[in-house]
Amino acid sequence: MREELNQGLIDFLKASPTPFHATASLVQRLEAAGYVRLDERETWHTEANGRYYVTRNDSSIVAIKMGRNSPLHDGIRLVGAHTDSPCLRVKPQPELQRQGFWQLGVEVYGGALLAPWFDRDLSLAGRVTFRRDGKVESQLIDFKAPIAIIPNLAIHLNREANQGWAINAQTELPPILAQFAGDERVDFRAVLTDQLAREHGLNADVVLDYELSFYDTQSAAVIGLHGDFIAGARLDNLLSCYAGLQALLNADTEETCVLVCNDHEEVGSCSACGADGPMLEQTLRRLLPEGDEFVRTIQKSLLVSADNAHGVHPNYAEKHDANHGPKLNAGPVIKVNSNQRYATNSETAGFFRHLCMAEEVPVQSFVVRSDMGCGSTIGPITASNLGVRTVDIGLPTFAMHSIRELCGSHDLAHLVKVLSAFYASRELP
């Protein structure tokens, strides 16, 4: 089971270079399992024990397995994650021609570790909006091949490189895509038009706009002398999206189960499809009883907010509280912060720990050092907007927000097992 899950994750990561592609990958797997799309612009007709999903902006998704038991009586079981990861996004007018090289200007999305982006074989993917036969359409594209690189400056020309180097995102991050002689000009939108024709057989009259991100073409892999680790891009937080999906597909229960994967977590979640937007609540209000009964249902429900945790790094162990250093391959981590950067409380933490113990899954705790700031997740945002009890958890990870992150190869199976138990739980606290 472990090897199968890990390979499934690797395949999912490869198919999901952007939030748009991640959502499409989730949709593909849900539809294969019998889930039916609900269109937000139409009237919904649902039934007990039905399986449905809703997307917004092509980058966020809510999947629902309706239970035969009344949500008003038993509550609902929610797992939340996010589809986006820090990256380099192409600017609207990106063309740069310097010293005979054709480059694209980029904007840093989220809190990316920038140095690892240098000297990597990069490709480009995302969503393109275009006009065809007088109609405006959108399509996902993925060049897949390594078409760009951001070469480092040789140490001979930057002797201070190993003593700390502040990277200028405006001048030092534009990737190189080609070299030209003379005054030859390249129209980036024409390149996208060609890609639409090549990848989808679409003859666009004009490319109107796009949302495109560079990504590392190196596939994720199980690595280590004994295969102890998984290295790959976008583990934060596609790892949790995939674990939540597998648990939902495993769910054979009479209870109502929900998986929500939001976009824009890495930039604050404030969007129509982000966790700080109305998507989840609007979806639930259309599926659950109204008014007083809706509030009662939510108060009987529980959200597991799944987002990667910081594993204790052997070279930087002092960056962790001495008593709270989560280890790779030692199970999911319950994340706690007294300032509500995480939504965990003693009741929700206790219930998650109870699930882990019942499933014989190891479990750990994380709290940030008292002299350091703490990151956050969709947990507190969803809890405050929806009023649902929440526990923040995640799998320990190294190099979070790097172009290539690292997690334990045993932990995915641990997380899927406990999330499956959560979906199957007959009673919530």
UniProtKB/Swiss-Prot annotation:
Keywords tagged on the record: Aminopeptidase, Hydrolase, Metal-binding, Metalloprotease, Protease, Zinc
Signal peptide residues on this chain, from the entry's feature table: none
Enzyme Commission number(s) of this protein: 3.4.11.-
Record-linked InterPro entries: M18_aminopeptidase_2, Peptidase_M18, Peptidase_M18_dom2
Pfam short name (any one): Peptidase_M18
CDD domains, A to Z: M18_DAP
Cofactors, names only: Zn(2+)
Top-rank lineage group of the source organism: Bacteria
Keyword Metal-binding in annotation: yes
SUPFAM superfamilies: Aminopeptidase/glucanase lid domain (SSF101821), Zn-dependent exopeptidases (SSF53187)
Keyword Methyltransferase: no
GO CC annotations on file: cytoplasm
Enzyme class: hydrolase
GO biological process: proteolysis
Positions annotated to bind Zn(2+): 82, 156, 401
GO molecular function terms listed in the Swiss-Prot or TrEMBL record: aminopeptidase activity; metallopeptidase activity; zinc ion binding
Protein family (similarity comment): Belongs to the peptidase M18 family.
Protein name per the record: Probable M18 family aminopeptidase 2
Protein species of origin: Pseudomonas fluorescens (strain Pf0-1)
Gene symbol of the encoding locus: apeB
